[in-house]
Amino acid sequence: MTIQWPSEAIWEAVVPLLPGFTVEVLPEIDSTNTELMRRARAGQLDPVLLLAERQTAGRGRLGRSWISEAPEASGSTHPIASLTFSLGIALQPQDWSGLSLAVGLSLAQSLHPTLQLKWPNDLWWQDRKVGGILIETASVGALRYAVIGIGLNIHMPTVALGGEAWRTPPASLNEVLPGVEAPDVLQQVVLPLVKCLQRFEAQGFAPLQADFQTRDLLLGRELQCSDGALGTGRGVDASGALLVHTASGLKKISSAEVSVRPRS
């Protein structure tokens, strides 16, 4: 089934903000993030949106896999069960802290008022994950190139990878926005994301802190951190660090290597 991607419309909207911007759509690749990082290390630093209809070695945070299967493999009858793309862009913010939170906020604001954000890089809906973000950077000379990978569930597959039933099913955007398809979502999120990145480059995360708090999944909830700490979510600070009130006081978590889960 041929999918009509809004490549030209996205290019026309974004190129005035990012001269030299291109849009590429591939039927299959190992990972859009991996490909853009390969290009960056080879000196290719132009702004680009790279989309793959299928990723065979997609990656999430902490090395977790994100594989976008063909519809028949996932049990879906829709042309694209998940939307996976990466945006490559040179950025020079004074402080990189909070970038993944800014990206997540932009996506949630573009898509639906009920989407929530789980620190540091996930979109959730009704206590189930609907998407994730992976940000990597490459330094080439004085430039630093950011590769922002995004994966969003569009339709719920009927089976988990490997043919087993889901233990805890993720959410899909079709539950939130009935009838939406991957090309619609792509066109809806890219231009606001570029504007968000340019604002972040100029102002950092601090101006976004209050808006993030309105969608903060962990705020006020009992949390368990992968380092063993237990506490209650107290939001994020102006740098995007997670604040957790523990028995020993207020704990600030700034490392994305620490995983945090709600206990209730």
What name fits each language-model region?
Residues 1-3, 91-115, 125-264:
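Long, positively charged amphipathic alpha-helical accessory segments at protein N-termini or as interdomain linkers
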Residues 1-110, 263-264:
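N-terminal lobe of the biotin/lipoate ligase/transferase fold
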Residues 19, 44-46, 119, 128, ...:
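Short, basic and Ser/Thr-rich N-terminal targeting/leader segments
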Residues 27, 117-119:
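Short loop/edge segments at beta-strand edges and connector loops
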